[in-house]
Every structure is written in C-alpha cells, then in structure tokens.
Amino acid sequence: MQEYKPFKEGKVREVYDNGDSLIIVATDRISAFDHILRNEITKKGAILTQMSKFWFDFTKDIVPNHMLSVDVNDMPEFFRNERFDGNSMMCKKLEMLPIECIVRGYITGSGWASYQENGTVCGIKLPEGLVESDKLPEPIYTPSTKAEIGLHDENISFEQSVEVLEKIYPGKGADYAAQIRDNTIALYKKCAEYALSKGIIIADTKFEFGLDENGNVVLGDEMLTPDSSRFWPLEGYEAGKSQPSFDKQFVRDWLKANPDNELLLPEEVVIKTVDKYKEAFELLTGTKFES
C-alpha cells in the first residue's frame, strides 16, 4: 500500500497530493487568534467536512467548486480507514488566489470596533446610528490577504485586491477580482436566506477561490462552516448587544477572559464547542450528525 504524507499543513487542515487531485483532511485541531490550541475538538473535522459538502452541493448553480468526493472508497487505500473516514474530501487541484473573500451581513467583531471608531468597516462608509449586531442594509465585501501561520491576515480594499491579482495575472486582475467579489456576495445572499429559514443567522463568512486548468474561477477551501463563519441563533436575536453563537466565538470569549490560558481549554469548553458545531450542522442540513 502506498504511504501518503501531507505536503501542506494549515492550522487545522492537512493536504495530500493524489496525482490529478488533492485530498484535504479536516483535523480536530482548533485555532483562535491565529494560534493553534493544544486541545482537539472531537469530531470537529467530520462536522466541517460534511457541512462543506452540503453547501458545495447547495451552491453549485452559482459557481463551480472543487469537491469531487467525500467517500473514502473513491480515494487510495491509505485513506480507507477510521482516521480519514468522514473528515476527508477529494478535490480538484486549483491555483488558489491569494485573497480571503470576506462578506459581512451584520456588524460585529472587528467590524463593529472599527465602525465605533470612524463609521467605517474596512474603509467602507456605513450609515450612521448602527448598533452592535445590526443587519447591514446590504452585505459588504471586505477582502483580506492570506497570512502564513503565526501572522495576521491584513484587510485590503477591493482596489488593492485588483492590484494584488494584477501583479500575478497581468491583464486579468480586475476581472478575477470582480468575479470573486460578485460570487462571494451571491453565495452569501443565497445561503444566508436559506439559513434564516432554518433558524440561523449567518453574520459573516469567508470564501476562497482558485483557478482551474482553463483559468476559470472555482470555489475552493471550506464553505460556511463554524470555523469560517459566524452563526447566530435567530431565536433571541436582538441588535444592540453581542449574540450567542454556534461557532468558535465560545472559544474566543474564553481565551479573552483567561489571558494566561497557555492555549489550553478546559474540558467543559471543549464539550460545549462540539455541541454547538453539531447543533449548527443539524439545523442547517436537516440531518442528524452521525459520528
């Protein structure tokens, strides 16, 4: 049996080369504030993979995506075991664009802090009088650069995203930048409307895109998971305060409240985080998470 080693390890993912495809494995690691924590969140990788699959299927009419299969029987023998079953996705190879495509439908987090300071979010002027967690009149696109592990992503304007892409793809930067912006907004609008019907507000999220062998823009990475998004319960939503969430915010809040944490979470925080991820999965997909 051929052995495989990841050629790329991100904060929470491992990527294996499978010839004409990639196998992306979502681990149970969790990161916050650009650091990898010492705990693992049981079954987190499987929940994220199955949730991405759901959204990729749901949005393939808007933009093609990189997913080929989540069935380990379609993968080499090395992956056909408990370690990889459920948390692995075989994907098309893409040349990833170096832009994180962030879309915000509600004002919260760093966006809220910036708005309080100067009435803008990532340089975009917003109406006066907004309160924390308010729904924005229209979703806003706030791209950022992709940072290496240990470094912070940097917010950039749309115009700067054009410049970044133009340097790599002369004559095509403006077109690619517009395509990923327009796809980001379209994906968010469709999915946010659907999620609302299931009792979940998608406050914000991020997408990543790449180019296939023909230079077409394709959606890659993960999609609308609790790792890449802020999910709030619709029940009890009230603008003017921070909201409870189904995502990593629970972990972030604990780390902020315990600055001497040494990146180690107490067991009850781990259990609550798993429960939140599962609840979000089951509400959104309408299926029970089978661990």
Regions found by a protein language model. Give the residues of each.
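Anionic ligand-binding catalytic core segments
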Residues: E117-D175, L219, M223-L284
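Conserved metal-phosphate-binding beta-hairpin within the catalytic cores
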Residues: V103, I202-M223
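Active-site loop/lid in soluble adenylation, ligation, and acyl-transfer enzymes
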Residues: M1-E148, N261-S291
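Intrinsically disordered, low-complexity acidic/polar segments
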Residues: F33, W112-A113, N214, S228-R230
